[in-house]
Amino acid sequence: MSHTEVKLKIPFGNKLLDAVCLVPNKSLTYGIILTHGASGDMNLPHLMSLASHLASHGFFCLRFTCKGLNIVHRIKAYKSVLNYLKTSGEYKLAGVFLGGRSMGSRAAASVMCHIEPDDGDDFVRGLICISYPLHHPKQQHKLRDEDLFRLKEPVLFVSGSADEMCEKNLLEKVAQKMQAPHKIHWIEKANHSMAVKGRSTNDVFKEINTQILFWIQEITEMDKKCH
């Protein structure tokens, strides 16, 4: 399915956040917000590849850049983007999925667990965590799991089985205690950057993109049956 690229500036305090939307050339239903990790920006090859894959299957996709290592700042920026989409007269979406890579997924998780039930028009449908940074390398005793336990909407984790910031058995233990419906897809032998020895980057991207699309489609199909 064809789509159009639209560049945006989203108000955030007295600044503007750079964003790019891929808008499918059909009536819109669901959208996905994506952002980068501690380094890079919205033009990270993997985010571009994922956005393009989702848009080609009919999903509105917004990527945005928010630089800086201050997680509170990143969370506020993410909230501004979500509010922009929610109140946008231009893109009337039935719901959105919040997503991000590494630190971006932490920001998305925090935004999602602080949505008040009375905001509750079910606009946010799920969370996509790519390389969720559960702990600093070699600091497995300090887990960033508080927000994960507060989530209620469905969560998809896509992580490398050799991720130095997300030990496999630790994420599995955390997931077992979560109240939200969740799924973990492990990319075999991938590190935190999703690099796998002996596998091309595009091949890894393809696996990740396929898993994410399938998971989103499962939820949106269920939505259609319920309404």
Curated annotation (Swiss-Prot):
SUPFAM superfamilies hit by this protein: alpha/beta-Hydrolases (SSF53474)
Alphabetized Gene3D superfamilies for the sequence: alpha/beta hydrolase
Q: Which Pfam families match?
A: Abhydrolase_11
Disulfide bonds, which pairs? none
* The protein's name in its UniProt record: Testis-expressed protein 30
In its UniProt entry, the species of origin is given as Homo sapiens
Gene this chain is encoded by: TEX30
